[in-house]
Swiss-Prot record:
PANTHER family: MUR LIGASE FAMILY MEMBER (PTHR23135), UDP-N-ACETYLMURAMOYL-L-ALANYL-D-GLUTAMATE--2,6-DIAMINOPIMELATE LIGASE MURE HOMOLOG, CHLOROPLASTIC (PTHR23135:SF4). The keyword Cell wall biogenesis/degradation applies. One of its GO terms (biological process) is cell division. The gene is murE. Keywords: ATP-binding, Cell cycle, Cell division, Cell shape, Cell wall biogenesis/degradation, Cytoplasm, Ligase, Magnesium, Nucleotide-binding, Peptidoglycan synthesis. This is UDP-N-acetylmuramoyl-L-alanyl-D-glutamate--2,6-diaminopimelate ligase. It comes from Rickettsia conorii (strain ATCC VR-613 / Malish 7). It is found in: Cytoplasm.
C-alpha cells in the first residue's frame, strides 16, 4: 500500500490530503470517510468538482466514478498517507486538558517560549497562534482538538517553518474519539475538573476517564504529568496515574509547587509560592487565583522541557491575559470571560467579588448554549444568585433550541433572587453597562473570545468585547 500511495502522489502531483469536501483544494486527494453525522461518500462529486485529483473510498458502489480508487480500509489508507505526506512535527510537544483553563495555559506556555527566545505555536479553542515568527496557518477547523489530519498538517507546516515547540489543547471529546491517534507528548497538563459535556459523556466518571486518556495514551514513557492539586478528584487522579506508572507533579494550594499567598486587584496580582524548598514571588497583570495556578502549570511545563526555572519565572511579568479570559476591557471595570460552566462562572464571580470595593456592586450578564449540557443551566443560575448582586439573563448561542426555554432553565435555579431577562445579547450588555455606578464591576460571561453568535443554522458576527467597547462609548460608565 505504501508503495502504491507514494506512486499515486508522484503520478498525480498531489499537493495535499483532505477529508472535507468543503475545504478540498486543487490537486488534493479526498478520502471519503463515513463519520458520525456525515458520510464522505456522499460528497465525492463535490470534491472532484473542486479539483481533487483522486478519491479514496472503501465503498465499492463509488468506484464506477472516474478518479475513484477502492481500498479495503479508507481510514488505514488515510493514516498511511498522512505519514508519507505530513511526517514532521515540532521537536517538543505539550498537551493540556481540563474543564476550564486549557486555552489560558496553552497561551501562557507559548508566550513564555517566545519570551525565552524560542519559536513556538499553540493550537486550541482560539485557533492556531504562532509566536516568534509570522502567522503561517489558515483554514483551521473550529474544534478544540483538531481531527488527526488537520493536526498533522498543521504540525508539519509548523515544523517546516522552524517552529520547535508546540502546545495544544486536548478536549474530552477529542480524547474519547481518539483524534490524536499515536501522537506522543513530553508533558501533559490537567488544569481543572468540574461538570461539563454530560450531554456527550453522560456521567462525570466517564468524563474524567476521557480526560485521563491523555496521560495513559499520549504521554511519552519519560514524560511528566502536571496536575492542579486543587482538583476535587485529585487523589483518584494521582492513584490512577500511579497505577499506570506515570510520573506526576502537582501545582496549587496543596501542591508540590505550593501557592502560599495571592494579593489581587483590578490591575493584576502578586503571587507567592514555594518550590524545591525555595520561596518565590512575582507580579502579573493577569487576575484570578485560578489563573495563578494556570501560570504556574505553564512554568513547570517549560521547566521540565529543559529550561532553567528562574529564567521561566523572570519572564512571567510579560505574559499577557488571553482574549476572553478574565479580559478587562480597556480601563473600565468590565470583564469578558469564557465562563460557560458552573465551576468557571463561580470562579470568575468569586474573583471579582473578592477584588471589588466593599460598597460596590457586582453584575453579571450571561446565558447558556443550546444543544449542549442542559443539566448545568439551573446550576449556573443558582451560582449567579449566590455570587452576583445584579443578574441579567440573555442568550448565548441558542443554536437549534428555543432560547426562551434555555433562559427559563437558567432562571429556575435563581429562585428568590432578582434578575432581569433580556433576550438580545447586545441589549443585555448595554443594560448592564447603563446600570453601573461608581466602582461597580460587570462580568459578561459565556462567549469570551468568540466573534460570532449561533442562532439556528446562522453564524452571526458578535464579539462581547467589541459590543462592550461600543456601548462604553455611548453610555460613558465610570471606570
Amino acid at each position: 500500500m505504501s508503495h502504491n500511495l507514494k506512486q499515486l502522489f508522484q503520478q498525480h502531483n498531489v499537493k495535499g490530503l483532505s477529508i472535507n469536501s468543503k475545504t478540498v483544494k486543487d490537486k488534493d486527494i479526498f478520502f471519503a470517510i463515513k463519520g458520525q453525522n456525515t458520510d464522505g461518500n456522499d460528497f465525492i462529486k463535490d470534491a472532484l468538482s473542486k479539483g481533487a485529483v483522486l478519491v479514496i473510498t472503501d465503498n465499492k458502489k463509488n468506484i464506477v466514478i472516474d478518479k475513484v480508487i477502492y481500498v479495503k480500509d479508507v481510514q488505514a489508507a488515510l493514516y498511511e498517507a498522512i505519514e508519507i505526506f505530513y511526517p514532521k512535527k515540532p521537536k517538543d510537544l505539550i498537551a493540556v486538558t481540563g474543564t476550564n483553563g486549557k486555552s489560558s495555559v496553552v497561551s501562557y506556555i507559548a508566550q513564555t517560549y517566545s519570551l525565552l527566545g524560542k519559536k513556538a505555536a499553540s493550537i486550541g479553542t482560539i485557533g492556531v497562534e504562532i509566536f516568534g515568527c509570522v502567522n503561517l496557518i489558515n483554514d483551521v477547523p473550529e474544534l478544540t482538538t483538531l481531527d488527526y489530519l488537520s493536526f498533522r498538517k498543521i504540525a508539519h507546516n509548523l515544523a517546516e517553518n522552524g517552529i520547535e515547540y508546540l502546545v495544544f489543547e486536548a478536549s474530552s471529546h477529542g480524547l474519547d474519539q481518539a483524534r490524536l491517534r499515536e501522537i506522543k507528548v513530553n508533558i501533559a497538563c490537567f488544569t481543572s475538573f468540574s461538570q461539563d459535556h454530560l450531554d456527550y459523556h453522560h456521567t462525570k466518571e466517564n468524563y474524567l476517564l476521557a480526560k485521563l486518556k491523555l496521560f495513559i495514551n499520549h504521554l511519552l514513557p519519560n514524560g511528566i504529568a502536571i496536575l492542579n492539586s486543587d482538583i476535587e478528584e485529585i487523589e483518584f487522579v494521582k492513584d490512577y496515574l500511579h497505577n499506570h506508572n506515570i510520573k506526576f507533579i502537582t501545582v496549587g494550594t496543596k501542591g508540590d509547587l505550593e501557592i502560599t499567598r495571592l494579593n489581587g486587584s483590578l490591575k493584576g496580582q502578586n503571587i507567592n509560592f514555594t518550590f524545591n524548598n525555595r520561596e518565590y514571588n512575582f507580579n502579573t497583570p493577569i487576575i484570578g487565583s485560578f489563573q495563578a495556578s494556570n501560570l504556574l502549570i505553564a512554568v513547570l511545563s517549560i521547566h521540565y522541557i529543559g529550561f532553567a526555572f528562574d529564567d521561566v519565572i523572570d519572564s512571567l511579568v510579560e505574559v499577557k491575559a488571553v482574549k476572553g479570559r478574565m479580559e478587562r476591557i480597556d480601563n473600565t471595570n468590565i470583564f469578558v470571560d469564557y465562563a460557560h460552566t458552573p465551576d468557571a462562572l463561580e470562579k470568575a464571580l468569586t474573583e471579582l467579588k473578592n477584588i471589588k470595593l466593599r460598597d460596590s456592586k457586582l453584575s453579571v450578564v450571561f446565558g447558556c448554549g443550546g444543544n449542549r449540557d442542559k443539566a448545568k443551566r439551573s446550576l449556573m443560575g443558582q451560582i449567579a444568585a449566590k455570587r452576583a448582586d445584579t443578574i441579567i439573563i440573555t442568550d448565548d448561542n441558542p443554536r437549534h433550541e428555543d432560547p426562551k426555554l434555555i433562559r427559563a432553565e437558567i432562571i429556575s435555579g435563581i429562585e428568590k433572587a432578582d434578575y432581569t431577562e433580556i433576550a438580545n445579547r447586545e441589549e443585555a450588555i448595554k443594560y448592564g453597562i447603563n446600570n453601573l455606578k461608581q466602582d461597580d464591576i460587570l462580568l459578561v460571561a459565556g462567549k469570551g473570545h468568540e466573534n460570532y453568535q449561533i442562532i439556528g443554522d446562522k453564524k452571526l458576527p458578535f464579539d462581547d468585547a467589541e459590543v462592550v467597547r461600543k456601548c462604553v462609548k455611548v453610555c460613558h460608565p465610570v471606570a
